[in-house]
Structure formats: structure tokens, C-alpha cells
Amino acid sequence: MLRILTLSILATSKLASAHVVAWHPGMYCLGGNDTSVDDPNTNLAVNPLWDLPKSKWWFQADRGCDKAPPVDGVFLELPAGQNFTTELAHNRAQTTLSFNGQYAGEWPDGKDHPEDWSGTGTPPGCIQDDGAIHTNNQTMAGGTVFAISYQSDMSQVTMENLVVFSVLEHTPWKRIATYEVPADLPPCPDAGCICAWGWVPQGCGEPNMYMAGYKCKVTGSSSTKQLAQAQVPKYCANDTSECVGGAKQILVMNQADGNNVVAPDNDFVAYNEKWGFQNGAQNDIFM
């Protein structure tokens, strides 16, 4: 009976909101926005951000996620010069963080799909059986990023001190997502840093955006380098000399205020080379 009930809840929650976030024990809203309750079936953190004032979209304040930190002492650990893994899924229940991982599969929805999964037609249209990943195929997935601020208090994090340090091209795609960490990323303060995950879908569905928060800390680092101030990315597909190098901000679009980019004619906003983001660790973000 319990398994039937659980499956029913999973099906209902997926239909209600089937989007994606990077799940990890160090995230805000891991168990929902009530820290007295650990909801193994929550999808609150996956919901997109659209037409909101900055006071609401910033770290998902619209749903109270900015007030729901992870358990004390739990961090997203960032091993300098190495990599870390998160789980991209529509619901916490579809990860290894709930129900002993029994509903976690190779893909974000926990279902089976072909390795060359794509929409129909030539060129392929949007994938219709799971629009939650907002893409036509893997190569057209918009890319996701992690950014870091060397502030321990979220109220002190700004667009200028939140720097993208890792890019994973052609994601979201499969559930397991591994991001590279710059070797020179310095240690965090004793209370840790604040990190953010970002994604702007490249077409296929509403042109919204995603941002989630994490308590994080850099491990295995003795670097004394400092991060440069994050600059606004610039579309540079037609002229690479126009690309913004070095430390960059997350992409913000289609909000009521606080936007830093707009979609170019006949193209998309995305974390890719067209916007100056190279895949992997961002090793040029230091002063």
C-alpha cells in the first residue's frame, strides 16, 4: 500500500511541475521550505523563475528556499582541481537522496530513454515526452553552471561577488552531472561559502530560468588567489572578440527586474560559448 501511495504521489508531483534542479545534501530547500520537516518527495526547488522582482527570484526567495538552509555542518564540497557530482532530477524522490534511491534512474525523470533521445523530425523538434529538460536533443541542451560567493551570509551575496566557476555543457541531460573545480579556487571562510546552480533553457518551453542555493566549501586548497568581480556576460557568437573573459555573473533574463541579459535576435540565452562560457572549470576568474 505504501509503495502504491508513493508512486501515486510521484506521478502527481511530476505532472504538476516537471522541471530540473541539481540535488545535493548541501542545498537549500532539500526537504522543502519548512526546516522542521524533511519531505523526501519535494519538488519545490525545481520550479522555474519567471517575471519576478529580484527580491523574489534571488535564491528562490519566492518560495522561501532562501530561508531553508541545509543541516548544520553539511556542505556541497568542492575539491580544488578535481570535480564534484550532483543529481539532476525533477523531484528529490527521483534521486538517491530519497527512498534509498529506488526511484532514481539514468535520466532526470527516473524513466528509461534511448541513448540518442531526441525530438521527432529533421532537424529534431522539442522532446515532447519530457519537456522538463527543455531541449531537442543532448547537443542542444543549454548548459548548466555553478557559481560561488565567498560570503557565508546569503544576505551579503551579490551579482558582483557570485562568480561562475564551473560550466557543464549540453545539460541538463542525464541524472548524474559532474562539474569541474578550478585548481586555484581558494578556501572558504570557516562558516563556508554560498554557491548557486544556474540554468537557462535554450528554447523548448517557456523562456524562464533556474537558480538554486547551496552551502559550499572548497577542500584541498591552499591557494591565496582572490576572485575578480563578476562581469555581465555578453553574446558573442558573431564576433569572439566581443566575448567577456574572466569572472562572469550568472545569466538573468525575463524577470520583472534584475535582468542582466536579453535574448539576441534568432538565438537564445544559454551557458555556452556563444555567451563566452567555456566548458569545464573556469580558470580565468581570478584577479
Swiss-Prot record:
Keywords: Copper, Disulfide bond, Glycoprotein, Metal-binding, Monooxygenase, Oxidoreductase, Secreted, Signal. Its cofactor is Cu(2+). InterPro entries: LPMO_AA14 (IPR054497). Binds 1 copper ion per subunit. Glycans are attached at N33, N83, N137, N238. Residues 1-18 form the signal peptide. Its main location: secreted. Its EC number is 1.14.99.-. One of its GO terms (molecular function) is metal ion binding. It comes from the Eukaryota. Disulfide bonds join C188-C193, C195-C216, C236-C243. Belongs to the polysaccharide monooxygenase AA14 family. Lytic polysaccharide monooxygenase (LPMO) that has a broad substrate specificity with strong oxidative activity on pure amorphous cellulose and xyloglucan and plays as a bifunctional enzyme to decompose some specific network structures formed between cellulose and hemicellulose in the plant cell walls. Catalysis by LPMOs requires the reduction of the active-site copper from Cu(II) to Cu(I) by a reducing agent and H(2)O(2) or O(2) as a cosubstrate. This is AA14 family lytic polysaccharide monooxygenase A. It comes from Talaromyces rugulosus (Penicillium rugulosum).
